[in-house]
């Protein structure tokens, strides 16, 4: 218990960094610029990234929890009255991470354990009542914990509803490349 093995590929990457590293100075508060640009290209693709111009920013965080906490702090400062809507079920850390930043948390129906399917009609009915300025947290792919992902048509319907109702979609994309592939797993991100 408490022993996380280090994979051979991680050891190889660490060796490569050790051989090529030229300084031990700190990186800036946003993280490593080259890393951030590579992540942005992987997430958005070259064409969308180019069209976004200066309307996006990439910040390196200490893991997924760190990124979610940074996002929660940003949301609270930008819109302290916003409610963040999370799926039922959602990853066990979503509610405490977002709630500890002082955000209001509500849930929307997502998964039916008896049929092993997404409760999409119920989800849309609930999200149609979300207030303008609220945020809806979606899992980009490999939904944690149920594994049931939205299809393209469902993503399209959510986009249309978000535009109509004025809520912001907030996507947790922890597993890009592990579902349908690197490109397929970012359909929702690139759509929205």
Model segments located where?
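Conserved core of the PLP fold type I
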Residues: 22-168, 177-178, 183-190
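A short, surface-exposed helix-loop junction/capping segment
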Residues: 18-20
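Conserved Walker B
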Residues: 173-174
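A structural motif shared across PLP-dependent enzymes of the aminotransferase-like
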Residues: 1-16, 27-41
């Amino acid at each position: 218990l408490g022993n996380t093995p280090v994979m051979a590929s991680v050891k190889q990457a660490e060796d490569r960094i050790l051989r090529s590293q030229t300084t031990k100075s700190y990186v800036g508060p946003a993280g490593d610029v080259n890393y951030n640009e590579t992540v942005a290209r992987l997430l958005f693709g070259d064409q969308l990234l180019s069209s976004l111009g200066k309307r996006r920013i990439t910040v390196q965080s200490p893991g997924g929890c760190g990124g979610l906490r940074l996002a929660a702090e940003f949301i609270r400062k930008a819109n302290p009255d916003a409610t963040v809507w999370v799926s039922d079920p959602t990853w066990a850390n979503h509610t405490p991470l977002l709630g500890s930043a002082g955000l209001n948390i509500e849930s929307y129906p997502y998964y039916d354990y008896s049929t092993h399917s997404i409760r999409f009609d119920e989800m849309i009915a609930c999200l149609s009542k979300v207030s303008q300025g609220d945020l809806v947290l979606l899992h980009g792919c490999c939904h944690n914990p149920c594994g049931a992902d939205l299809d393209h048509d469902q993503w399209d319907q959510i986009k249309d509803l978000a535009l109509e109702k004025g809520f912001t979609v907030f996507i947790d994309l922890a597993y890009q490349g592990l579902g349908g592939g690197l490109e397929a797993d970012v359909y929702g991100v690139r759509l929205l």
